Swiss-Prot record:
GO terms for biological process: polyprenol biosynthetic process. It comes from the Bacteria. Substrate binds at residues 31-35, 43, 47, 75-77, 79, 81, 198, 204-206. SUPFAM superfamilies: Undecaprenyl diphosphate synthase. Belongs to the UPP synthase family. This is Isoprenyl transferase 1. Keywords: Magnesium, Metal-binding, Transferase. The gene is uppS1.
Length: 249
């Protein structure tokens, strides 16, 4: 894995042995709305402020050497929010992707997209696909943008795919195991989640990477997402490195 030389604003990452780092970190970026409410601002201002946190955490992940990072950007349940907020979120996400992809490319980040295209619109889907294409040869880190993503739907889609192959005679029902199911997930080349991290003090998983997080270490941090920075991310990595993982044993 290549670590690119970038201006890291003078921040030195903690020394964490590579063997003690999580390979795959999944992050629920929660608290934008509450951040705005605390300041008597419209909710969309919280989402705008969250962009800086996202960029800083991605920078910190590359800097310290985390190879896989998944960010929960927009869930399938987010469609239930107020229509004006949903429209803003989709438009803002499109703009952030277009605005930041050259920076990610410069950092050596490969951007991937997990989710379904339904209802996203052709322009946003094109931005996602273009970004995947532009960054596909990058090797510093794999960034999984989870947009219009829901873990239960991902599992349902995987099961449907397996059932179709069984009915077509391509595989036998007896051969179906965990590895086959994992290979039908949206990102089959990503390892299972080692560290599941959530901001804002909420202690729940919210339908994010349920299959992949079966044996993940869970860390819930109180800071709201717009205030979250790479130092907070590194603090979570240090906490993870001090844990003894059991993998269900």
């Amino acid at each position: 894995m290549e670590i690119f030389s970038v201006d890291w604003t003078g921040q030195t990452p903690p020394h964490i042995p590579r063997k003690s780092l999580p390979r795959h970190v999944a992050v629920v970026m929660d608290g934008n709305g509450r951040w705005a409410n605390q300041r008597n601002l419209p909710r969309i201002e919280g989402h705008k402020a969250g962009e800086s946190a996202l960029i800083d955490v991605v920078a910190g992940a590359v800097q310290v050497g985390v190879p896989y990072l998944s960010l929960y950007v927009f869930s399938t349940e987010n469609w239930l929010r107020a229509p004006d907020e949903v429209r803003f979120l989709l438009r803002f996400t499109r703009d952030v992707i277009a605005r930041r992809r050259e920076l990610f490319a410069h950092w050596g980040v490969r951007v991937r997209w997990s989710g379904v295209p339904n209802r996203l619109g052709k322009v946003l889907v094109k931005e996602l696909r273009d970004t995947e294409e532009i960054t596909k040869k990058n090797t510093a880190m794999n960034l999984n943008v989870c947009l219009n993503y829901g873990s239960r739907q991902e599992i349902v889609n995987a099961i449907k795919s397996i059932v179709s192959d069984v009915n077509s005679g391509l595989i036998s029902a007896k051969s179906v195991n965990e590895k086959i199911i994992s290979r039908r997930m949206y990102m089959p080349d990503f390892p299972d989640v080692d560290l599941f991290l959530r901001s804002s003090g909420e202690n729940r998983m919210s339908n994010f990477m349920l299959w992949q997080s079966a044996y993940a270490e869970l860390i819930f941090m109180s800071k709201l997402w717009p205030d979250f920075r790479r130092d907070d991310f590194w603090a979570a990595l240090r906490a993870y490195s001090g844990r003894s993982r059991r993998f269900g044993r």
